[in-house]
Every structure is written in structure tokens, then in C-alpha cells.
Amino acid sequence: FRCLNSTWPEFDVEGRSGAALPTTEWLLHAIWQRLDPQLPLKSLRLYEQSTLWADYLGNSMEAFLTIRSHFAAAHRLAREELSQSENEAIYGKCARPHGHGHNYLLDVTVRGEIHPRTGMLCDLSALQQLVDDQVVEPFDHTFLNKDVPFFSTCVPTAENIALHIADRLKAPVAELGASLHKIRLQESPNNAAEIYAEAAQV
């Protein structure tokens, strides 16, 4: 193991004017700068841990930061105006009257400029707290159809849940100085929904 602050000139804040702090975002940018002259790079991803990573596409100081959270919830896929047989024809077993549950994995990706002083796109602790307050706490261990008012009139498919999460997060993320880029909600090993917030105009 090596300390980046002392072994990479880019992060020698004591000995070099203009050096940066070795945040995940800045480290990814520095790696790009080192590799770009030798490789035709399109994108780079750097994991700090399994629940936090950054992406860089070579666009000046713009980068993407993703945090992963999870929650457990139950739901039933059915429209009230349809019969049980009609709902089962559309949603299959997911329309059964008493619902079923999932352990959801939630990836929240924000986009922004790497700040020259902090080396971050936004306050990471504030972003995590925002996701906890706006999504995890209100959704965890609930029956979405009955416990989350939005889903009393909207079928809680993975797509609709992801869209609602994007709607809840877009404005608060902007207040942190970043833009909500993407929501990825994994419902099961073979089923996930992705919402690109800017394209969806939530």
C-alpha cells in the first residue's frame, strides 16, 4: 500500500502548489491524464468500494459519482379498475392479491464539476443522507401500494418506482450543486429499471 498524497505529485498538497486532494473523483481524473497520451480512452470507472464509484468521460472537469443503497419492500402489480384475471393477464404472478416482496438495490448517479478545492462533485455525506431521507427511510419495509401515497394510484412496477425516486431526488440533488443523472433500481437478479433523469424530464 502507498499513500497517494506522498507518492503521486498530483496529490502532494504540501510540496506542490495547485495539488489536489486524492478523492475518488480527482484520482480518476489523474489516472485519465496519465493514460490518455498512450490509450484511446472513452471512459474510466473507479470503485472506492462496492457502494461508491466514479466515472469520467474526458470532458474537462465533469464527472459522475454513484452511490448504492438498498431497501426491502413489498408490492402488488394491479390496476384497480381491472378484474383479477385481467390483471394476471398483464402482470402474471405479480398481480396476486396479497403481493410479494423484493430486496431492491438502488444506484443513484449524479453529474457535476469536480470542485478544485474539495476534489468532489458534491458533499458525499449530504448526498447519502438525502437518499436515506427521501428513499430508503420512506420505502424500507413497506407495502408500497398502501404505505407510499404515490402508489395508491400508480402501479409500483420497477419502472414507476425508479421514476418516482428520480422525481423525489432531482431538486434536492440540485441544491447540493450537482445534477441527478441516472437512477438504476434492481428488483431481482434478472430485472432492473434505469431512468435517465434529464431525458425523462422528471
Where are these regions (language model features)?
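Charge-rich, low-complexity N-terminal segments
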Residues: 1-202
